Regions:
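Short, conserved sequence motifs used for protein processing/export or organelle targeting and
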Residues: 1-181
Length: 181
């Protein structure tokens, strides 16, 4: 687990595995079962976004460490969104094998489960940092970070995810990409 993952988990109104959150649209505690995911995600993907995001990363290898420079640029194409907008920079890792508790299985433990897109941590904290207030069409922001890479994470299997949300947690747009492509 991670601090960020624990925060997201504790926001749920009901906790069980597997379970998913999709955009915190109505309430941050809303949850959906796997059978609901596909149709709800399809609906969300049809929503127009007022914000375009770009991520650029540079990896700097030192003898004893790796530094990651992260640059996120956002541009608004609508004035229909207001309030404080927060940028969260999250890291996920895929192809991890381990024990997964799944109440729908018998036995409930799947010991050789392959985890993909497992939340590992963040640059900004789970809820992010305010990057712009009351944006108008044409407004932009740029945020730059340097991160000392956690050597326990396989960088070749990791993604960086930029999430911009409003002050209620509703996700305005997000973008993810592998750190090494």
């Amino acid at each position: 687990t991670s601090e960020e993952g624990d925060l997201f988990w504790n926001q749920l109104d009901f906790q069980a595995n597997p379970i998913g959150r999709i955009n915190r649209k109505f309430d941050s505690g809303d949850f959906y079962s796997p059978g609901e995911w596909s149709s709800i995600v399809d609906e969300e993907l049809q929503e127009p976004t007022p914000l375009e995001l770009q991520i650029h990363t540079d990896i700097i290898n030192y003898p004893d460490s790796v530094h990651l420079n992260v640059h996120v640029f956002g541009q608004y194409f609508s004035s229909k969104v207001s309030g404080n907008h927060r940028l969260s920079i999250l890291f996920s890792e895929s192809h991890l094998i381990g024990d997964q508790l799944d109440y729908s299985q018998d036995p409930e433990h799947v010991y050789d489960y392959e985890f993909n897109h497992l939340l590992r941590g963040s640059l900004t904290g789970a809820e992010g940092l305010t990057v712009i207030e009351n944006p108008n069409s044409g407004d932009t922001f740029q945020s730059d970070f340097t991160y000392d890479w956690n050597s326990d994470w396989a960088i070749n299997n990791c993604q960086i995810i930029a999430v911009v949300s409003d002050e209620n947690g509703y996700i305005i747009n997000c973008l993810g990409q592998y750190i090494i492509e």
